[in-house]
């Protein structure tokens, strides 16, 4: 029977927490800016860790520059995190941009725009009264029985 939380998953969770702290407190590179560590996938042999990060930037060039800065600093970040974790071998860190959070925010904004547009159209053309809708429903019920 497999364990509910495997060792690789536990190490991934701890690595995510330590990376977040290191990136927030210890990294002084202005090119990186504010970065969020969304998830960490650790390989089964613990030799590689794929770190999914998000930047709150919409410009793809700026995001790529920040990601390149993180990739260049990966060995230094690995050293800092290794000092905070008690592992025999520290996984090699590979940073990957995760656009799911930004896409989710974009979709939420689109839904909000549609809702606001609908409200504006209702105000412009007048809203339909509930009484009119109820009368239409009653009339359709009456006509269904007379077929």
From Swiss-Prot:
Entry keyword annotation includes Hydrolase: no
Comp. bias (Acidic residues): 128-147
Record carries keyword Hydrolase: no
InterPro entries for this protein: KH_dom-like_a/b (IPR015946), RbfA (IPR000238), RbfA_dom_sf (IPR023799), Ribosome-bd_factorA_CS (IPR020053)
Principal location listed in the UniProt entry: cytoplasm
Location of this chain's protein in the cell: Cytoplasm
Gene Ontology MF terms in the entry: ribosomal small subunit binding
Family matches, as Gene3D superfamilies: 3.30.300.20
GO CC, alphabetical: cytosol
SUPFAM superfamilies: Ribosome-binding factor A, RbfA
Keywords: Cytoplasm, Ribosome biogenesis
Region (Disordered): 122-147
Family to which this protein belongs: Belongs to the RbfA family.
Subunit structure: Monomer. Binds 30S ribosomal subunits, but not 50S ribosomal subunits or 70S ribosomes.
Function (record text): One of several proteins that assist in the late maturation steps of the functional core of the 30S ribosomal subunit. Associates with free 30S ribosomal subunits (but not with 30S subunits that are part of 70S ribosomes or polysomes). Required for efficient processing of 16S rRNA. May interact with the 5'-terminal helix region of 16S rRNA.
Designated name of the protein: Ribosome-binding factor A
Lineage, opening ranks: Bacteria, Pseudomonadati, Pseudomonadota, Gammaproteobacteria, Alteromonadales
Gene assigned in the entry: rbfA
């Amino acid at each position: 029977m497999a364990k509910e939380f495997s060792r690789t998953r536990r190490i991934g969770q701890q690595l995510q927490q330590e990376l977040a702290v290191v990136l927030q407190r210890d990294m002084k590179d202005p090119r990186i800016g504010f970065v969020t560590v969304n998830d960490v996938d650790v390989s089964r042999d613990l030799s590689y860790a794929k770190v999914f990060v998000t930047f709150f930037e919409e410009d793809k060039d700026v995001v790529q520059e920040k990601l390149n800065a993180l990739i260049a600093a990966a060995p230094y970040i690995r050293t800092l995190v290794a000092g905070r974790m008690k592992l025999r071998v520290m996984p090699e860190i590979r940073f990957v941009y995760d656009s799911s959070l930004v896409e989710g925010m974009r979709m939420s904004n689109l839904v909000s725009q549609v809702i606001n547009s609908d409200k504006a159209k209702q105000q412009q053309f007048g809203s339909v009264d509930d009484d009119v809708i109820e009368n239409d429903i009653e009339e359709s019920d009456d006509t269904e029985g007379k077929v």
